[in-house]
């Protein structure tokens, strides 16, 4: 137990931040699972693209609020995007080196 008022306030603030950060992290997990579910259900292209856009917004919001690290956010977005592209069969062909 904190002995000073300021220490009590810091405990309250840290608990509030923890709850908020966990909420952001929970939303990221939920949207990721929803994308996986839609892929397994053979969802339409439009539906998946809207869901992907929504997931990017959620991840960026969590990043901007400091709930997740910027590298984690970038990695998560990249993995989700690759997963959706692979499902849709839109993988870009590997570029061949230019012969000079």
Curated annotation (Swiss-Prot):
Residues 1-26 are annotated as: Disordered. Belongs to the bacterial ribosomal protein bS20 family. GO terms for biological process: translation. Gene3D superfamilies: Ribosomal protein S20. This is Small ribosomal subunit protein bS20. The keyword Ribosomal protein applies. Signal peptide: none annotated. The lineage of its organism: Bacteria, Thermotogati, Thermotogota, Thermotogae, Petrotogales. Keywords: Ribonucleoprotein, Ribosomal protein, RNA-binding, rRNA-binding. SUPFAM superfamilies: Ribosomal protein S20. Pfam families: Ribosomal_S20p. PANTHER family: 30S RIBOSOMAL PROTEIN S20, SMALL RIBOSOMAL SUBUNIT PROTEIN BS20C. GO terms for molecular function: small ribosomal subunit rRNA binding; structural constituent of ribosome.
């Amino acid at each position: 137990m904190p002995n000073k008022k300021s220490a009590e306030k810091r405990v309250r603030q840290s608990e509030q931040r923890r709850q908020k950060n966990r909420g952001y992290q929970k939303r990221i997990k939920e949207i990721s699972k929803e994308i996986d579910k839609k892929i397994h259900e053979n969802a339409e292209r439009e539906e998946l693209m809207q869901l992907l856009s929504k997931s990017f917004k959620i991840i960026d919001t969590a990043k901007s609020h400091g709930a997740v690290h910027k590298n984690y956010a970038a990695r998560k977005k990249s993995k989700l995007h690759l997963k959706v592209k692979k499902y849709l069969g839109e993988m870009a062909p590997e570029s061949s080196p230019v012969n000079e």
